[in-house]
Amino acid sequence: MADGGSGMCWCLRRCGKNQEVLLLPDGEEVTMGRGLGVTYQLKPTLCPLMISRTHCLFKQNARDEWTVTDNKSLNGVWRNKERLEPHKAYTLSEGTLIQLGVPPPNMESAEFEYILVREHLDKVSGSLIRPLPGKTKATRTKRKFPSEDADASGNEGPSNFSIPKFCRVSRDGEDSAKSLRTSHKQPKASGVEPELNDSVETDTVSPTQQQCCRSTLQLSRVRETMEEIRRLNVQIQEKQIKMQEKLNHPQESQLGSNSYLVVQKELQALRNQLSNEQEQHLQSVKELKEIFQEEQQSMGSQKQAEEEHLKEQLAQALQEHTQLMQELNRNKNDFEQIIQAKNKELQETKEEKEKVCAQKEEVLNHMNDVLDNELQCIICSEHFIEAVTLNCAHSFCSYCIKSWRKRKEECPICRQEILSETRSLVLDNCIDSMVDKLSPEMKNRRAALILERKEMVQAEESNPVLVVSDSSSFLSDTFYISSSSSDSDELGSDFWMVNEEEEYEESLFGCGTDELDSSDFESDDDDSFLIV
């Protein structure tokens, strides 16, 4: 099997992912196909009938070169992408690409592609494929012929025409047609693998591909039968011509009555064979028509099923679309209701806010009224600054009442004698908190007044005041202002402090010396004067 000493051997390495190796033993014939009587059985998965029963033959020639022969396969044998003629040996060399069959639809390469290589046996032993058990060379199945054909062949002797060959061809076609018809009309029995029918696994092949392969195979058989019929017609004509020539020259041929009967039987056998071939051809054509009709029916039913499936999918899609639109409408209505509720709530909030603002404005106005009417000093007409409450419960600014008491010791409002002064923190805090809620202008004005009062207090502390009771004594650069008693309604003219600088008087009482009435300077002898 391998070269002696070197350990080299010839083998076929399969192309593709499954790199299996087929060993080519030296001096032996190697057959490949999908049948049982071959060396290596090939089982196509994409197209079950792509490989014939005995597809090709590998053997060595006289120069120990390997050759490949196409055994008239249906889809042919290809050497380096060139198809080989049937029954003709082609020499192979190392690296030659052998392709069995044609590429299936939607594929670029065939399922079975091999490269002839010469490698060590130990190197490829792990990938070797074992041949089928039995003889390496395929043996033909012996068939029993009819008695007439047997007698004719036995009595004829040596002849250029072999009747058993045509009988074998016709029986093969008949068996193939029967097996195809049986496999097409009857389901396969579980656990049984028929030998005459296609012994391949078709679980992974779609029904459409199986039907296509069957129709292709049946068409090829019809063509083979037609070729055999033509061949039989030609041979019958040749036989008749030879027989006619022998009958026309009886002396040369020296035919006796027995020889004439033999020739007649031979012609009759050929005619019977021809009629059988014609019947088988008609039967094959009929079966082919049935297969085509079944294919059309299956395609029509498949198309109808696909249309129904598409209609169901369309109806389901429309139903889902309707449900989706209904759900969207419900969501839209819900969103509109939510938006309306939010708008209503926003409007209510806005109205409440406006009410609160109005109430706040009303409260501020009321606070201003309270500040102007109740928390205002009657002497300076300003809000209390460091409020002081007298024993008579009347309140004044601390600075204002101190300035008043320098002239009189009685309340400017009720004329009750002043006995005590009490600082009122409650009024100060209340006024401060109320002023904080007023406008910034009011806040700044009050802060300026407080600062001014502090400066005035500091100025008085630095410049003391003298009280002179003698009305005839005068000091230079001073004014004498009468402090006559008058009604409480004219408090603005009861107490005046006159200085040379009129700005000081205006800041304190809000008026200048020009506004004083002449009656304010008239005084009795008991009146006292303030000298600044």
From Swiss-Prot:
Q: What is its main location?
A: nucleus
Q: Which GO terms describe its cellular component?
A: chromosome, telomeric region; cytosol; nucleus; site of double-strand break; ubiquitin ligase complex
The FHA domain covers 30-84
Query: Which stretches of sequence are listed as region Disordered?
Result: 127-209
Q: Where are the zinc fingers (RING-type)?
A: 377-415
Which keywords does the record carry? Answer: Chromatin regulator, DNA damage, DNA repair, Metal-binding, Nucleus, Transferase, Ubl conjugation pathway, Zinc, Zinc-finger
- UniProt-listed GO biological process terms: DNA damage response; DNA repair-dependent chromatin remodeling; double-strand break repair; double-strand break repair via nonhomologous end joining; epigenetic regulation of gene expression; isotype switching; negative regulation of transcription elongation by RNA polymerase II; positive regulation of DNA repair
Fetch the InterPro entries from UniProt: FHA_dom, RNF8, SMAD_FHA_dom_sf, Znf_RING, Znf_RING/FYVE/PHD, Znf_RING_CS
TM segment ranges: none
Catalytic activity entry: S-ubiquitinyl-[E2 ubiquitin-conjugating enzyme]-L-cysteine + [acceptor protein]-L-lysine = [E2 ubiquitin-conjugating enzyme]-L-cysteine + N(6)-ubiquitinyl-[acceptor protein]-L-lysine
Q: Which Pfam families match?
A: FHA (PF00498), zf-C3HC4_3 (PF13920)
**A GO molecular function held by the record:** chromatin binding
Record-linked CDD domains: FHA_RNF8 (cd22663), RING-HC_RNF8 (cd16535)
This enzyme's EC code(s): 2.3.2.27
Pathway field of the UniProt record reads: Protein modification; protein ubiquitination
UniProt subcellular location: Nucleus
Cite the SUPFAM superfamilies for this sequence.
RING/U-box, SMAD/FHA domain
Per its UniProt entry, which superkingdom is the organism in?
A: Eukaryota
Biased-composition ranges for Basic and acidic residues? 169-178
The record's annotation in HAMAP family points to:
RNF8 (MF_03067)
Q: What is the stated purpose of this protein?
A: E3 ubiquitin-protein ligase that plays a key role in DNA damage signaling via 2 distinct roles: by mediating the 'Lys-63'-linked ubiquitination of histones H2A and H2AX and promoting the recruitment of DNA repair proteins at double-strand breaks (DSBs) sites, and by catalyzing 'Lys-48'-linked ubiquitination to remove target proteins from DNA damage sites.
Subunit annotation? Homodimer. Forms a E2-E3 ubiquitin ligase complex composed of the rnf8 homodimer and a E2 heterodimer of ube2n and ube2v2.
Q: Which family does it belong to?
A: Belongs to the RNF8 family.
Domain notes per entry: The FHA domain specifically recognizes and binds ATM-phosphorylated MDC1.
- Name-wise, this protein is E3 ubiquitin-protein ligase rnf8-B
